[in-house]
């Protein structure tokens, strides 16, 4: 992932995450990029053009696959502690390993502890290692 991070930084953006998914029988290698103020279509295109010839020679996955480059979006997966840090002030839905569901605003991140304001200014701390799945969400 470090090499990928260094490559996308050449286009003036940061690597948010990368994943391999199987949709409708197609293998898709998704690269999510970010930067302050958001990423443009042109920046996604620049990263795609940078990665395509490299991945033609050294594919990231075996077999046939498709490369997709995009922003992580407004409602995005939080799979790394850094993602929570970048999302301070945003709402998140968190599912713990014991299947408990927590919804609230990310207030702070210290070491591997994430502080969530759940309701009536009540806050709870969650250890990152106890999180099974998390994503941001918009409250309308």
Curated annotation (Swiss-Prot):
GO terms of biological process kind: ribosomal small subunit assembly; translation
One GO cellular component term noted in the UniProt record for this chain: cytosol
Top-rank taxon: Bacteria
Keywords from the UniProt entry: Cytoplasm, Ribosome biogenesis
Subcellular location(s) of the protein: Cytoplasm
Pfam family membership, one: RimP_N
InterPro entries for the chain: Ribosome_maturation_RimP, RimP_C, RimP_C_sf, RimP_N, RimP_N_sf
Sequence similarity: Belongs to the RimP family.
General function of this protein: Required for maturation of 30S ribosomal subunits.
Name assigned to this protein: Ribosome maturation factor RimP
Gene name of the record: rimP
């Amino acid at each position: 992932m470090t090499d990928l991070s260094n490559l996308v930084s050449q286009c003036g953006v940061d690597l948010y995450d990368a994943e391999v998914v199987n949709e409708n029988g197609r293998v898709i290698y998704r690269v999510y990029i970010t930067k302050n103020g958001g990423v443009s279509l042109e920046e996604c295109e620049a990263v795609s053009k940078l990665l395509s010839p490299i991945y033609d020679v050294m594919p990231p996955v075996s077999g046939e696959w498709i490369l997709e480059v995009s922003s992580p979006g407004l409602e995005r997966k939080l799979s790394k502690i850094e993602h929570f840090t970048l999302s301070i002030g945003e709402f998140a839905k968190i599912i713990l390993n014991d299947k408990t569901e927590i919804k609230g605003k990310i207030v702070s991140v210290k070491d591997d502890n994430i502080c969530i304001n759940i309701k009536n200014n009540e806050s709870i701390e969650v250890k990152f290692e106890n999180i099974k799945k998390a994503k941001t969400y918009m409250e309308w």
